[in-house]
A protein has these predicted regions:
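Conserved core of the sugar-phosphate nucleotidyltransferase
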Residues: 1-64
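Conserved alpha/beta core of the MobA/IspD/sugar-nucleotide pyrophosphorylase nucleotidyltransferase superfamily
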Residues: 39-116
């Protein structure tokens, strides 16, 4: 659960039952006409893995898509290309991967989640 789901600095995600990303936004999503107390909102933790073909498509656009520009979230360009994005739910705080040594920590978490 996010500490501050209204923060525009934290992209929020909505995922379907197949663990595919439906949408990501800096706005509070999913929205509701009613006030829902204690609603759990999920944030994006980035580990991107795309094949060469998908990356070539991404860079072939040469510029940000309209929705990518509005949200300032690069993963939305893959939406415009029709590329599905799989998600993994983490029940703990996010792990930063800023150095090579951090990769092993992240891989261990992913492996344990895939076994569930």
């Amino acid at each position: 659960k996010l500490q501050n789901p209204k923060s525009l600095n934290l992209p929020k995600v909505v995922v379907n039952s197949k663990k595919e990303l439906i949408y990501i936004s800096r706005s509070l999503i999913p929205g509701s006409k009613k006030i829902i107390k204690d609603k759990a909102y999920f944030k994006q933790v980035c580990i991107y893995a795309f094949n060469k073909k998908e990356l070539k498509k991404f860079y072939s656009l040469k510029m940000k898509s309209e929705i990518e520009s509005m949200e300032d979230i690069e993963i939305l360009r893959f939406f415009d290309l029709g590329i599905k994005i799989k998600m993994v739910k983490l029940n703990s705080n996010s792990v930063a991967v800023d150095e090579i040594a951090d990769v092993k920590k992240a891989e261990k978490i992913i492996r344990s989640k895939n076994k569930q």
